[in-house]
From Swiss-Prot:
GO terms for cellular component: host cell membrane; membrane. Keywords: Host membrane, Membrane, Signal, Transmembrane, Transmembrane helix. It is found in: Host membrane. The lineage of its organism: Viruses, Duplodnaviria, Heunggongvirae, Peploviricota, Herviviricetes. This is Uncharacterized protein UL124. Residues 26-47, 110-140 are annotated as: Disordered. It comes from Human cytomegalovirus (strain AD169). Belongs to the HHV-5 UL124 protein family. InterPro entries: Cytomega_UL124.
Length: 152
């Protein structure tokens, strides 16, 4: 069981590392000025923010307005990338948990009826402990002792 928990932790760490190292994508409603003429169009724009190459710069750099493509979101994953990643992570974790539970249940094998019958016929069963001399029942309750003979 400890091995399964370790695998789940490693999987979660991999997903967290992948989410932290990917570029942050945000879909924002904005007004894009495609040329210097002042013509604007209201739409959604998919903006990628990147850290600048120089470590002395403190602000985030955004792409040029002329390089930004104005488009409408086409799917759920384009509109909500974080929610899509979270749903994918939950699905993967659920599958891993189901597989680990299935392997745990499968590892606890019970002997088949044939094996237990052979063991009983050979007499390798542990004998039952003797009954106590004094019954744990209260005195007003009658005691009934029954011995079941064992045929060999």
């Amino acid at each position: 069981m400890e091995r399964n928990s370790l695998l789940v932790c490693q999987l979660l760490c991999l997903v967290a590392r992948a989410a932290a190292t990917s570029t942050a994508q945000t879909t924002l409603p904005s007004t894009v000025n495609s040329t210097a003429t002042g013509v604007t169009s209201d739409s959604y724009q998919n903006t990628t923010t990147q850290l600048p190459a120089s470590s002395s710069a403190a602000a985030l750099s955004l792409p040029n307005a002329s390089a930004v493509q104005a488009r409408s979101p086409s799917s759920f994953s384009d509109t909500y990338p974080t929610a899509t990643a979270l749903c994918g992570t939950l699905v993967v974790v659920g599958i891993v948990l189901c597989l680990s539970l299935a392997s745990t249940v499968r590892s606890k094998e019970l002997p088949s009826d044939h094996e237990s019958l052979e063991a009983w016929e050979q007499g390798s069963d542990v004998e039952a402990p003797p009954l106590p001399e004094k019954s744990p029942c209260p005195e007003h309750v009658p005691e009934i002792r029954v011995e079941i003979p064992r045929y060999v």
